[in-house]
Structures are given as structure tokens and as C-alpha cells.
């Protein structure tokens, strides 16, 4: 709360959930806290990598000024190198309480993912369904390369984990995550819609309360089969929330979200986005032709 209060000096406004401040917003940007109080910047829609890099460094400068005043240090790594799971302070956000209860049922390291990992995520646009198909095929095919290039999470609980990216290991043993085989079969909008609709719900928002959705799919929601919320039908906000709980290495919203890179130090913050934009906004057809020859099973098993 002290950090959020000091950030208000830079024009950030609070986002409230009941009596709790759960984030900040300014223009098209927001700052939120993940389950283990990892700090996340969601940037504005920008035209190029240079604008995105400048925005990130402005945000980090503001954060640096605040942490100096509070005598805090920032750890920029893909996994908490010090704390045990039980030592991580919990975020009071309601949805995280439901996730903490249900997520371990589908993956043994799900709570480590929630409370101890940090990633560099990149949102990229597409201008047609054909463009999306090519880009989505490429980004899924290069996931092992992205993990290897930007690995930054070898230390766990003050010891060498034996992994260059322990964060990646955790994500492979996390509920609702991974690289689904169907992502390599020329995934188009209709196929992704089918995948998402039949994907299990994580939670359901009933007015201001979050309920477990573990017994239902989004298809059940669409067909009015969830008695706990009086069989109401989903809104666009419900769909947006559901899409954000599909924790695959890459996913589709109104943009393509790339999620396989560890958080890295400030000096390499723009490297991951530059790597991916170079591939996807360079010779797209050449990259697509190359990855189309790769064995999807080898890609999946390499992560």
C-alpha cells in the first residue's frame, strides 16, 4: 500500500476491490499485483518496439524512485530466488483465493506458478485470420527457443535448481498450462473458439463474489447450466475473464499473447520483445515455411 501510495505521485490512480487496493491505472496502462505480490505492468497499445521499450523504462524509473524511498530492492527474475512457498505474502484478491484452492488439482506446481514466478509477456496484433494462423504457428513452434534464450530463474530457495529456467519447469507442471497439440494444427479462429469454449472454467463471477467453476466448461455457461448463478448466460466480460485463465504458453485474446519468457534484468528487458517482433514482423512467410517442417512432438517434448 505504501508503494501504491507513492506511485500516485506519478499520476497513478487506485483500482479497488471492496476495501482493498488491488492495482493502479494511468491512461491506457495499469499496475497490478499477482498472487504472490509480484508487480506487473500492463502497457498501453503502442505502434512499435521502441515505444514499448520507452514505456517500460519510464515505469521502471518510477518504480525505482519509490523503492528507494521505502528502502526496498527489486528482484527481476523468473522465479523467487529466496522465499519458500509458505513465506510468500498472499494477495487478498478474491479470484486468487479460488485459484489457490482449485489449481493444485490439475498440476503439482500450480501454487509455485501463482506465487513465485514472474514472466515477460508480449502482446502482438494480427491483421487477418490468415496472418493470425501463421503467427500463432510460429510463436508456438519457437517456445523452446524463447525459453532457452531468456532463461533467468536458476536459483530456487537460495540454491541452484539445476534448471536454467525453473520457471519453465513449473509452468509445465501447472494446471491449465503447457503447449496443447492442437495449437500446431493450423489453429484458426473457429478452432480456437472450440478449444476455449470446451476448456474448463476456473471461476465464475457472481455479482461481486468469485465462485469455483471447476465442475463446468464455458460451454456449460453458454447453455445456462450453472445453477450456482441461477443459470444466467455469460457476458462479454465473462468471456474475457475465461480467456485470461487459459494458461498455455501462448494464447489468443483480441491479440496474440506470448508467455514463455522469464522476467529478465532491466538491461535486457526489451530483448525478448525485439526477438519476437523481428521474427513476426520480418519475413513472416519464410519463418512460417521453416517451422512448418518441424516435428510438433519434438517441440512439445523440448519445453
Regions found by a protein language model. Give the residues of each.
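Long, well-ordered mid-to-C-terminal structural blocks that present hydrophobic/aromatic surfaces
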Residues: 216-299
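Loop-rich catalytic cores of soluble enzymes, especially ATP-dependent carboxylate-amine ligases
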Residues: 79-251
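Terminal catalytic/cofactor-binding subdomain
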Residues: 1-108, 116, 254, 268, ...
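A generic structural motif
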Residues: 45-52, 125-132, 262-266
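Conserved, mostly hydrophobic/aromatic
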Residues: 41, 122, 258
Amino acid at each position: 500500500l505504501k508503494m501504491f501510495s507513492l506511485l500516485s505521485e506519478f499520476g497513478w490512480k487506485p483500482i479497488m476491490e471492496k476495501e482493498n487496493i488491488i492495482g493502479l491505472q494511468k491512461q491506457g496502462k495499469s499496475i497490478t499485483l499477482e498472487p504472490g505480490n509480484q508487480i506487473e505492468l500492463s502497457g498501453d497499445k503502442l505502434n512499435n518496439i521502441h515505444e514499448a521499450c520507452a514505456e517500460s523504462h519510464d515505469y521502471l524509473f518510477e518504480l525505482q524512485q519509490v523503492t528507494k524511498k521505502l528502502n526496498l530492492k527489486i528482484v527481476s527474475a523468473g522465479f523467487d530466488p529466496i522465499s519458500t512457498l509458505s513465506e510468500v505474502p498472499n494477495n487478498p484478491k478474491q479470484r486468487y483465493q479460488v485459484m489457490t484452492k482449485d489449481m493444485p488439482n490439475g498440476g503439482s506446481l500450480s501454487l509455485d506458478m501463482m506465487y513465485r514466478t514472474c514472466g515477460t509477456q508480449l502482446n502482438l496484433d494480427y491483421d487477418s485470420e490468415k496472418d493470425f494462423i501463421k503467427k500463432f504457428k510460429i510463436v508456438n513452434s519457437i517456445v523452446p527457443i524463447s525459453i532457452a534464450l531468456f532463461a533467468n530463474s536458476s536459483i530456487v530457495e537460495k540454491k541452484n535448481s539445476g534448471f536454467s529456467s525453473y520457471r519453465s519447469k513449473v509452468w509445465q507442471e501447472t494446471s491449465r498450462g503447457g503447449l496443447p497439440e492442437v495449437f500446431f494444427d493450423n489453429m484458426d479462429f473457429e478452432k480456437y473458439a472450440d478449444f476455449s469454449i470446451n476448456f474448463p472454467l476456473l471461476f465464475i463471477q457472481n455479482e461481486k463474489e468469485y465462485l469455483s467453476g471447476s465442475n463446468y466448461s464455458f460451454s456449460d455457461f453458454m447453455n445456462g447450466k450453472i445453477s450456482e448463478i441461477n443459470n444466467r448466460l455469460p457476458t462479454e466480460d465473462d468471456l474475457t475473464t475465461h480467456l485470461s485463465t487459459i494458461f498455455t504458453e501462448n494464447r489468443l485474446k483480441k491479440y496474440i499473447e506470448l508467455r514463455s519468457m522469464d522476467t529478465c534484468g532491466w538491461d535486457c528487458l526489451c530483448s525478448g520483445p525485439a526477438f519476437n517482433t523481428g521474427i513476426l514482423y520480418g519475413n513472416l512467410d519464410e519463418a512460417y515455411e521453416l517451422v512448418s517442417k518441424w516435428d510438433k512432438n519434438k517441440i512439445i517434448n523440448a519445453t
